[in-house]
């Protein structure tokens, strides 16, 4: 009897536990359940929260509710809506697809498989806002201030104006001269917001829209500094002006916008894209927060959103307007080298949009006509990034005596540099000229730790070379000699599997011919060890001393920089076999990006005339040098 009672008691405990658990589960996802005629739109799933948020941000303007929810399988779902299924789920999906911009694999959910919401767009406090449409002055009180919004008339032109007073005493009066109107209709706005909590009073954003095609909103920020008030010019922005959000959670709202300098620069407006800009008020200055680590995650989410959009529209990877702004975002995140490779392999070479650079200082924001020069897209993009601060602190030029931290590639455990060799010099390798100003390229490991570097063309005297820059991650070094006017290489960024290639260099110069060594082969793989896409695999024989030398195509263009050969003994230990002619070169696209980042625009390679082997050897010899260092 006692055993039966205990069994019955345990059964009731189990039932109670199940009921409690069910109740808790319902409580957890009650706000996610959709009953009746509504469903969530499931847009994407990922394990990365920042990726999910980046995707969700793309759809905020299209739905009342967008959020990231944890699904029962542990993945993160990007959901939006809810949408009506009154005409059926199929009709609801087709309506979304017909609107455009939605993934083909979206589906509708009643939320039962969703556990909890893990992210929603920050709500923020309501921002007091007043609008002025022209006519009679708008007068109101806010933040202890008496505010009057009106206009200043100059002939038939009218400009929005704002006046601040306290207890009848004038504090400041400002006019938006960049936003003129030719009638009584205006579109001015006043927002009262805390942009700088270090100031005792909130700030005022005074803005006005031009009502012109594609453009523009001009703004002034009024803030108290010391005992008085001052105004700060905001950027002239496409569309509706600054968006406001407290990103870093310090109680001060940041100003979000886009970099209008990218609009019309690389493509017509409709095909232009512009990267995110985050600004923060500090006293009487607007501070660019691109390089502030507190905002790195926000930029990462922005990038995820861009790349998700490109996943839905793969053709935009061929649009120069998109590529330029995407590269700017990648540069902010310190990933410009990898991004340049993508840009150089995909940009639209047939675009007829005029691209120029200015070879002189701007005069009132305009380039003197005589200093304007037409250039290729890569050169125009590099110049634009430099002028607008996107090369940033990740670009670090060094002096010859500097010793940067080595960052080995994934291939290091089983690949061996094709240099250095032992001999009279402490190391030796190959390099090649890349500009008529005497710039040349070699591997970083060839010149690492050198106190003196010399280069020599065949049959000529040695010339001293100085280090301009190094990239240890990609094993590149940029050198320069002062008195060289010889041939220099052209660079091609595309690489095709199986294409014929040649290697020129000065391997084993203490044993082999000192006049250079030329070998032929093919591109055998479009990635290095560990699928490292910075590199390509080649069958052309490589020996110690070839490091830093050119990999050339059938037309005499450089398509890579020889870096290493597979360590045969290490490979034997791993595979039980000795590989033959497994060698590696850094892609031409990575070389091109490295040079652009230091202001050098290589001559673009051509494929107009194929060269036979002797002509290729002569061409390679003309711009290649032996590199020695002590």
From Swiss-Prot:
Disulfide bonds: none annotated. GO terms for molecular function: serine-type endopeptidase activity. It is a multi-pass membrane protein. It comes from Sinorhizobium fredii (strain NBRC 101917 / NGR234). It is found in: Cell membrane. Residues 399-426 are annotated as: Disordered. This is Uncharacterized protein y4bJ. The keyword Mitochondrion does not apply. The lineage of its organism: Bacteria, Pseudomonadati, Pseudomonadota, Alphaproteobacteria, Hyphomicrobiales.
